[in-house]
A protein has these predicted regions:
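C-terminal interaction segments
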Residues: 1-6, 65-134
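Acidic, aliphatic-rich amphipathic alpha-helical segments
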Residues: 1-60, 109-134
Length: 134
């Protein structure tokens, strides 16, 4: 079954840089082999700007700049991104509602998201000691 979305309260507590770090951890390196994606992000409510860069099987971000040759650039409120991640809306719905503006090729974001792994939220931290059967 699909994993439930991250709660909106949890998302709101994360700084935007931390949110990009979460994405970086979820990146499936072998699937990203040979891919390069550059995305500009500008958040209208926080005034933050970021470049998200996929290169050499790693996803990195830099705050405070925009790449001149980005594949796509997105302008939105950080709260809108939280709504998308929390699955309260979809990226296309938010674009249609005028909450997300973009230039360039927005499909590059979809390509990036297709490279992400889903990890289980709940897992055994300590497992019971298994007795050898003789």
């Amino acid at each position: 079954s699909p994993r439930p979305p991250m709660p909106r309260e949890t998302l709101a507590a994360l700084r935007t840089g931390q949110l990009w770090d979460v994405l970086g951890v979820r990146l499936n390196g072998p699937k990203a082999e040979g891919k390069r994606i550059v995305l500009n992000w500008s958040f209208s409510d926080t005034g933050e700007t970021f470049v998200l860069n996929l290169e050499n099987c790693a996803l990195t971000h830099v705050a405070g700049i925009q790449a001149a040759a980005a594949d796509a650039s997105f302008t939105l409120a950080r709260s809108t991104l939280d709504e998308v991640i929390a699955k309260q809306t979809t990226f296309p719905e938010a674009v249609g509602a005028g909450k997300i503006k973009f230039t360039g090729n927005p499909m590059r974001l979809g390509e990036l998201m297709d490279l992400m792994d889903e990890f289980p939220r709940m897992f055994e931290i300590v497992e019971p000691k298994r007795m050898a059967v003789t």
